[in-house]
UniProtKB/Swiss-Prot annotation:
Native source organism of the sequence: Dechloromonas aromatica (strain RCB)
Domain ABC transporter intervals: 11-254
Protein's UniProt name: Phosphate import ATP-binding protein PstB
Domain of life, per lineage: Bacteria
PANTHER family linked to this entry: ABC TRANSPORTER I FAMILY MEMBER 17 (PTHR43423:SF1)
Keyword annotations from UniProtKB, A to Z: ATP-binding, Cell inner membrane, Cell membrane, Membrane, Nucleotide-binding, Phosphate transport, Translocase, Transport
Binding residue positions for ATP: 43-50
A single cellular component GO annotation: plasma membrane
Pfam family, one: ABC_tran
Compartment list: Cell inner membrane
UniProt xrefs under CDD domains: ABC_PstB_phosphate_transporter
Membrane topology: Peripheral membrane protein
Gene: pstB
GO MF terms held by the record: ATP binding; ATP hydrolysis activity; ATPase-coupled phosphate ion transmembrane transporter activity
Length: 259
C-alpha cells in the first residue's frame, strides 16, 4: 500500500464573497492553498482569478466601495487575513505580490529591493546589504546586477525587471507569493527563466499564480483551480485536472471548446 503525505495548509478561503460596489465578483469560494506548493488559477478573462488573488494581500482595500464577506485563514497562526483588526501592511509583509507587467520603482536596483525592508524598520547598512543580496540571489538575478546595484532599475531588460520585482517581493521573507500573469509581457526566454525560478522558489515559499497559459499552468503548478463567472468550478492536483477533470466546464475550457 502506498502512503501519501497529506499536504499542509498554508491558507484557506472560506465562503469568500467579494463585491465591487454592488457587483458580486466572487461567489462563495472555498479553497485550500497548500504550503510550499504552486497553485495555478485558470479560467476565462473576467472570471475572478485576479480578484481572488488580490484578496490575499488586501489590495482591494485601496479602493472605496470594495468589500469582502467570509474569511481567508492563514496558517499556522489561523489568522483571518480579511479581519478589520488585521493591519493590511502586516498582511503585505507576509503575502508578497508580483504583477503582470514589471513595475520597478524609479529608484536604483538596490533601493528597489531595500524599500520593503526600510518600511519594516530595517536601517542597518550591513543587514540591508545582506538581505538585498539574499533576495537578488533568490530571484536568480544577483550575478547579472551585483556590479551595478546603483544603476536605475527601469534601465534593466523586461525579464530582469520582473526578476527584480520578485526579489523585491522576497526581501521581506513572505510566506505566500502571488503572481498575476507574471510572464504575459515577456518573451519566451524570459518566460522560461521565470518558470524555472518558480520551481526553485516553492522550496521556500507558497505560490499562487494566475495564468491564461494552459501549458504554463501544467508546467509550473502542483494544484490547479478552474474559475468561471466568480465561482470555483473545480480544484485538484494539476495532473488530475488536466488529464481527467471531473466537471465538463473544466474539460471544455482546458480543451479549448470554451474560451
Amino acid at each position: 500500500m502506498q502512503i501519501h503525505d497529506k499536504p499542509t495548509l498554508k491558507a484557506e478561503a472560506r465562503n469568500l464573497n467579494f463585491y465591487y460596489g454592488e457587483a458580486k465578483a466572487l461567489k462563495g469560494i472555498n479553497m485550500p492553498i497548500y504550503d510550499k506548493k504552486v497553485t495555478a488559477l485558470i479560467g476565462p478573462s473576467g472570471c475572478g482569478k485576479s480578484t481572488y488573488l488580490r484578496s490575499f494581500n488586501r489590495m482591494h482595500d485601496l479602493y472605496p466601495g470594495n468589500r469582502y464577506e467570509g474569511e481567508i485563514r492563514f496558517f499556522p497562526d489561523n489568522t483571518n487575513l480579511l479581519s478589520p483588526e488585521v493591519d493590511p501592511i502586516e498582511v503585505r509583509m507576509r503575502v508578497g505580490m508580483v504583477f503582470q507587467k514589471p513595475n520597478p520603482f524609479p529608484k536604483t536596483i538596490y533601493e528597489n529591493v531595500a524599500y520593503g525592508l526600510r518600511v519594516r524598520g530595517e536601517n542597518n547598512k550591513r543587514a540591508l546589504d545582506d538581505k538585498v543580496e539574499h533576495a537578488l540571489r533568490g530571484a536568480a538575478i544577483w550575478d547579472e546586477v551585483k556590479d551595478r546595484l546603483q544603476d536605475m532599475a527601469p534601465n534593466l531588460s523586461g525579464g530582469q525587471q520582473q526578476r527584480l520585482c520578485i526579489a523585491r517581493a522576497l526581501a521581506t521573507d513572505p510566506e505566500l507569493l502571488l503572481f498575476d500573469e507574471p510572464t504575459s509581457a515577456l518573451d519566451p526566454i524570459a518566460t522560461g527563466a521565470i518558470e524555472e525560478l518558480v520551481h526553485e522558489l516553492k522550496k521556500r515559499v507558497t505560490i499562487l499564480i494566475v495564468t491564461h497559459n494552459m501549458q504554463q499552468a501544467a508546467r509550473v503548478s502542483d494544484y490547479t483551480a478552474y474559475m468561471y463567472l466568480g465561482e470555483l468550478i473545480e480544484f485538484g492536483k494539476t495532473d488530475e485536472i488536466f488529464i481527467k477533470p471531473q466537471d465538463k466546464r473544466t474539460e471544455d475550457y482546458i480543451t479549448g471548446r470554451m474560451g
